[in-house]
Structures are given as structure tokens and as C-alpha cells.
């Protein structure tokens, strides 16, 4: 039986598509970016630090948990690529202490919202008009 992981990706599956992958230099984000690239997409990755290995993806160094970082990403994408077709919001994480929600302070909640929710909100708001 052939599974989807056994098949070689169609190199034109995402041909002509511009794909943004946040947090695209390591782990799941890196794998997602590589898969879109194998499918023929123009891939744009963001992260706070440059990728350790050279690749063919366009890299934008930015901290998307900040308004300045998301503005940098939006402006560069609109100026260079005139928008995107697909956005993968991969960036995120948690710095919550152990002990459950009762131990989480308002400051930790705000930090997690800034790191996990606002990047998607800001990027969607800035890039969605180019996707319609």
C-alpha cells in the first residue's frame, strides 16, 4: 500500500504560489517550508534568527511577536512578491510555568498572546488584501 509519505511530491503542485511560513527555520516550520518548496512554491520564511543551513527560500529576519517585526515582513513581501497566496502561521510557543492556569499571571498571558495570537492577526490584516 502506498501512503502519501511514500509518494514523490508533484513539483508543480504549488507552482506559481507564494507561501509565507513563520518560524520556518527549524522543526515543523522548516519541514513545512521544504514541502512547499518541493511542490514548486516560492517560499518565504521568517524567524528571529537566520537558518543554520543555506536554502533556496527567501528569508526575512524579524520578530513577528512585535508590531515592528510584522510590519517589516508585510512590507518586504508586498514590495518584493506583491503579496502571498498561502500563509502558514507556525511561529509560537509557551513560557507558562508549571502548575496550571492558576499560576499564570496576567503578564504571562499577555506575553503568550503577543507571541501566539497577534503575529497571525497582524500578518493576516496586512497580507489578506493581496490574497483576495
Features from the language model and the residues they span:
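A glycine-rich helix->loop->beta "capping" turn
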Residues: 76-89
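Conserved NAD(P)H cofactor-binding loop of Rossmann-fold oxidoreductase domains
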Residues: 90-97
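Conserved glycine-rich Rossmann-like NAD(P)H-binding loop of the short-chain dehydrogenase/reductase
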Residues: 39-53
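Substrate-binding pocket helix/loop in short-chain dehydrogenase/reductase
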Residues: 98-101, 105-110
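Conserved glycine-rich cofactor-binding loop
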Residues: 18, 25-26
Amino acid at each position: 500500500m502506498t501512503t502519501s509519505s511514500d509518494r514523490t511530491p508533484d513539483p508543480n503542485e504549488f507552482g506559481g504560489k507564494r507561501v509565507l511560513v513563520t518560524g520556518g527555520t527549524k522543526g515543523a516550520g522548516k519541514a513545512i517550508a521544504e514541502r512547499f518548496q518541493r511542490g514548486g512554491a516560492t517560499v518565504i520564511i521568517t524567524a528571529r534568527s537566520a537558518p543554520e543551513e543555506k536554502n533556496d527560500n527567501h528569508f526575512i529576519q524579524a520578530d513577528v511577536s512585535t508590531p515592528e517585526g510584522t510590519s517589516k515582513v508585510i512590507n518586504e513581501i508586498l514590495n518584493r512578491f506583491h503579496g502571498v497566496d498561502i500563509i502558514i502561521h507556525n511561529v509560537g510557543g509557551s513560557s507558562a510555568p508549571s502548575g496550571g492556569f492558576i499560576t499564570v499571571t496576567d503578564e504571562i498571558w499577555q506575553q503568550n498572546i503577543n507571541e501566539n495570537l497577534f503575529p497571525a492577526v497582524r500578518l493576516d490584516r496586512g497580507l489578506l488584501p493581496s490574497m483576495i
